[in-house]
């Protein structure tokens, strides 16, 4: 089916396919381009563009950028304009369509599972990268036999795959927002809850065509909230739309639990050593893969004897580090050009140091941009260990929130709401358009749910001093449901003063700094879900991967709790069904949810608070 160029490029942009840099005024060094079909060990050939500096007075390192989204047809001058920071330093830049995509041969398998390293005849993205490096070293003139690989999102996942069975010449890996576990916390699931709208649209985009499919061919409604609600049972997706043509959807539907398929696809079994210097990059408001780079850093860190595993987290959405200044996201102003700072002062020095042997990268163990305070913080360890104390933010009566434990109560104290799958809470303001709003929804003003009776909001008094939260946050929810299954969504929010002098339009703004969901059926086991005992208090721990935020004096802290987040998260029937994808409309029911806040069932948010060092 033919697709217009405008549609194609929209979806390329949405998925952030390019590892790109914003053009900058710099003396550009010309490239010469050579196109090649590089053979893999099984005979499949991969479409590759090689851009080498025109000058030959020195040998240059090779930087590989692999993608499933199409490498395009950039001229040497266009590439020089697109990557000025790297152009001025001198790199051989290699772009490659992965197996089965665009002009490369073979069969595409989305997020192909790692092969057994002992099976030298099997192929995966690691072996394809190895074979590509081997060919480049032998066939590209003036290379210095040092190779790096970099990418964003899927491209970052490909970069991490290169580490599993690395070529000896691999000397640097830059993974920017790589997924690490598609069931636990990245694109397709969060703590067992299926990311419906993203999963459906992305799977269609990737698997309905060898190029880029357009989800508007399926979703023809102005407000996608309405389309997904009318969809009814998720079984209707396969019956009415996909009809066996989208393999990943079948995986979603047939493997709802954390089975060996998802575990083998995750990086946890494989990342047991640091095989190359690694720069892990994340964005605080990454709407797709915030969990991944944090998890990859944590998996590698115990094995990092040579101190070559680094973490950088900035105030970005998915791919925000690679384009523009990075001064604002939505309405949130960070006071400086954070993306430019990353590219010029972190990324390029890292690559130059490890691939050219020049200078020092100057990186600490971890570097985070502290939102609220709008400053870069250098850490000796992540999460921070010095000058940090664990504190608890307790839910209180009258929808208050404070660090003080609730007073003893003769009876269990709770707040309640009714959750209705027929009227789920939208995850962002409606209409939820297919072609806009996705990249900034995590920084939307959360006041759009103020009128909803199925959202509980607990808020503190105005702070008398700054409260800095840095590290891992865990929501401890003591809750019951009248049903036998339930989702629990918890959001931590910075509430701006009603009168915000520096920017009056931001008065009262509610900025979500952390939020996630937990599917109740997985409380005891992610592998073997169980019905929740009705009307019985259960303790749910909902982890947030990381945070570094300053709640400023005069601001307030808010915690919101709800049980639907639609359609980013599929609807829970609130009645235990062994496979929610097979739930019928008659299985969906309302449920009365209770959030407890006293005695041993005192719901709270555990936060690591930065304290002043002793004098």
Q: Model-found features: residue ranges?
A:
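N-terminal cap/lid segment of alpha/beta-hydrolase-fold proteins
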Residues: 27-58, 459-465, 528, 532
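Cap/lid segment of the alpha/beta-hydrolase catalytic domain
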Residues: 53-138, 187-188, 323-334, 452, ...
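Accessory cap/linker subdomain of secreted extracellular hydrolases
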Residues: 80, 88, 110-126, 161-273
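Alpha/beta-hydrolase fold nucleophile elbow
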Residues: 141-153
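Glycine-rich nucleophile elbow surrounding the catalytic serine of serine-hydrolase chemistry
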Residues: 151-161
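C-terminal, loop-rich substrate-recognition/catalytic regions characterized by aromatic stacking residues
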Residues: 219-235, 321, 326-615
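Active-site-adjacent alpha-helix of alpha/beta-hydrolase-fold enzymes
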Residues: 291-309
